[in-house]
């Protein structure tokens, strides 16, 4: 995830050249807002990110005639319908699992999407997802890797439903040291190891529930871990552009990016209200009020601040519940200091409750 510092990036963005024709040299086309594109080098991308500028790298869309799409129609429940099931699942969520998994993710030198340790960390995460599925014995559940045009791969776990309507919870798995992306130490405990382990624990919670497995979920559930978010939402773009071209019926996507920092003031979630789906946001508020023990406040993070923007841009309703109001986010991200010592695992467990409630209520919803 990225944090704004607009004035600091003005000089950097001024040197970029906008235009549909690719210039000579190693250049990337980025989108800083709807219809606002610029050509930049990889070094310029890194400097812009370090200065807080958010963007989507749309280089792979050249020649595809991409057109932003209106959201897929969805009918979200107006009332909680499965509180007994969800409450029993929440009781089995484990703070110890979150601590163990996040410690392991943080031990890689970095999880940068072009580094060798970025691949090694993805392989480790893939093995954890496989283990959860295998130990559950759930029929039909599977995990697959989705390759990108760079080293690190996406991971998608699927619990098939009886309909083609799909509900997603996702998090980016990569990390970055903004001073030295390829080789620098980037434990990425909060950004975004925290979101990654929350999604993993939500998967454990769903698959570990005999009541859920016996209920035969109506809608297909997917748990995503995206590669290359720090390079401009690269991995999530791979996934959602493919889903768009395939005509997938993604009815809801919940993004978990930054889930462990409690902030200095009142403990609360931040509901991202820009570049998200307002109807789905209202549903998220209902989930938080029912299943979490802390409040939620509206906040904004800017265009393309995280992977929900890839879903939204491709026509899929998306929301993001962040660790705090955006202005109170963790100041240690994108550095060697993004470590577990600054995180609160009780707060992270609240995120897991929300993810579990979101997936279960929508997974069981009829006529979504």
Swiss-Prot record:
- Keywords assigned: Aminopeptidase, Disulfide bond, Glycoprotein, Hydrolase, Metal-binding, Protease, Secreted, Signal, Virulence, Zinc
- Which compartments is it annotated to reside in? Secreted
**Binding-site residues, Zn(2+) 2:** 191, 230, 334
In this protein, the residues bearing a glycan are: 92, 192, 216
Alphabetized GO MF terms = aminopeptidase activity; metal ion binding; metalloexopeptidase activity
- Which top-rank group of organisms is this from? Eukaryota
Main location group: secreted
Q: Signal peptide: which range, if any?
A: 1-18
Q: Name one GO biological process term.
A: proteolysis
- Give the UniProt entry's GO cellular component terms: extracellular region
UniProt enzyme class: hydrolase
State which Enzyme Commission number(s) the record gives.
3.4.11.-
Q: Does the keyword Metal-binding apply?
A: yes
Family the entry assigns: Belongs to the peptidase M28 family. M28E subfamily.
What protein name does the entry list? Probable leucine aminopeptidase TRV_05750
- Organism of origin: Trichophyton verrucosum (strain HKI 0517)
